[in-house]
Every structure is written in C-alpha cells, then in structure tokens.
C-alpha cells in the first residue's frame, strides 16, 4: 500500500522524498513498479474510483454503509469491509458538524397541549397516515434563518417545508400548507410535533382542525418523542449547512432547497427504508 501511495503522489513530490518519509527503499519501489499488477489491485482501483464518485456526489457526507449501498445499486459486487478499507486508503471521511444556537425569541401563546398519540411509533403502513414536524435554524451573515419541515413517516420524504427570518406560527403553518398542497386533502392523518408555541398557536391548530388532522405532541422536554424529526435535521446540518458559511438568508434558502428537493428526497439513502431514497421507496410502493 505504501508503494501504491508513492506511485499516486510522485507527480506532486519526488519519489525519493516519499520513499524516505514512508521508510521504504527506492529500489524496492521501482522494482514494484515493474511488476505486473494483480487482478485484485486493478479491481481495487476501479472500485475505489466508483467509491470516490459516490462520496463526492453526496457532497462528502456518505459513510461506508451508504456508499456500499450505492455500489450494490450499480451492480458492483463487494463487501462492506472492502468499502471501508478503500475509503480509508483514500482518506474519505464524512465531516462532523459544528453547533451554534440562536436566541429563543419565539412567540409565547397560552394554548391547549395535545397528548402524545404517536408514542414513538415511527413507522407507517401507508403514506399520509403519520406526519412529523419541527423547525431548526441556519446561521447567515444577515442573521438566523429558520427552517420548518414536515416529514411523512411512511417514506421519510420531506413533504412540506418553509423558511423565514422569524420563528413564528406562520413559519410552521406554511410548511403544513405545502404538505397538504403536495399530498392532497388528508384522510385519517396524525400530525406530531413538539409543544412549541408555534404548534400550539390558534393559527396552526385551526389549520389542523379545518382538515380533520389529529394532533399529537411530544412530552415536555423529551426530544426522543420526535426522534425521527431530529434525525432529519441532524442530517441537514451535518451533510450541508454546518459546513458552510452563508452571506445572506437567500443564499441559505437556496442551499436548503437544493438539499431537500435535489438530494435528500430523490437521492439520499435512508437506513430505515432499506437504504433507498424517499422518492425511490415511494416509486417501489407504486406511489410515484
């Protein structure tokens, strides 16, 4: 492997420097170059190129398991351990996210709180039976941008979203309106969120009631009651927003849109649905 590294990088640094740094002889390296390459070596190079393409297509966010499922989808026969080995050789590692918190300037309205009807049952037998919702924040040079989303637990597809400079009832209402517009009039639908004032507001509760949607809310201070929604926002931040600096809110809006509609929904592999993307899962279920 040291000789392969030297061969790959000798166009950048002299081979004798690399040999010295890695503790191998120049004679051994040049003898290795003259040897015919093994079938395994050629195969590793071909698979390694495909692995790198998958990793870069995910904007450097995929770990070995998701890359592996990309390879299987392309018809490449290889095991997970081989993917891990070839990713290590190329130093392909998903980047961790940074964390920054906005001040709590949300609306404060006294309203009835719904029981936790969902009760951590994060699976749905059909679409438009269980929607989960929440909002998060993205830092820009102009200030915070708040992002609300609605996810269908059947396919993990983001069916509604909205973005605003303020975390108001209108923010979460707009996300639900988009979901209803996109999926059609709901029937026997459960909507789950936390107990934030935006979701307990009269405006939002009236929208649920007008469409006959059953309201469910997490218990106070219990993030695990909406863990699937937390998982989506963690992916959004880890895979996109936390690694970037946005000059304007419009720039952030465009990037969040790109992540949701051009990557997450149509392409991102999700472990909960057999490493398919949400839209691919819906296609296989005959919904798209």
Language model segments and positions:
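Charged DNA-binding/catalytic regions of mobile-element recombinases
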Residues: 1-288
């Amino acid at each position: 492997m040291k000789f392969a590294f030297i061969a790959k990088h000798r166009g950048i640094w002299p081979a004798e420097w690399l040999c010295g740094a890695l503790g191998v002889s120049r004679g051994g390296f040049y003898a290795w170059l003259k040897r015919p390459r093994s079938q395994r070596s050629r195969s590793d190079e071909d698979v390694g190129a495909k692995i790198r393409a998958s990793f870069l297509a995910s904007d450097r966010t995929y770990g070995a398991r998701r890359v592996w499922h990309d390879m299987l989808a392309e018809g490449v026969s290889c095991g997970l351990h081989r993917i891990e080995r070839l990713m290590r050789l190329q130093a392909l590692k998903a980047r961790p996210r940074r964390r920054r918190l906005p001040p709590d300037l949300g609306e404060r309205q006294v309203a009835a709180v719904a029981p936790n009807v969902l009760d951590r049952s994060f699976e749905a037998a059909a679409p438009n039976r269980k929607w989960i919702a929440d909002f998060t924040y993205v830092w820009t040079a102009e200030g915070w941008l708040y992002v609300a989303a609605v996810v269908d637990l059947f396919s993990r597809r983001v069916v509604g979203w909205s973005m605003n400079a303020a975390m108001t009832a209108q923010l979460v209402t707009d996300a639900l309106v988009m979901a209803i517009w996109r999926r059609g009039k709901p029937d026997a639908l459960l909507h789950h969120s936390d107990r934030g004032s935006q979701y307990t507001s009269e405006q939002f509760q009236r929208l649920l009631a007008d469409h006959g949607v059953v309201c469910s809310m997490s218990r106070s201070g219990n993030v695990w009651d909406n863990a699937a929604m937390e998982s989506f926002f963690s992916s959004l931040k880890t895979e996109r927003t936390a690694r970037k600096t946005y000059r304007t809110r419009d720039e952030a809006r465009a990037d969040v849109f790109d992540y949701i509609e051009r990557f997450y929904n149509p392409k991102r592999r999700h472990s909960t649905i057999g490493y398919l993307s949400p839209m691919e899962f819906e296609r296989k279920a005959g919904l798209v």
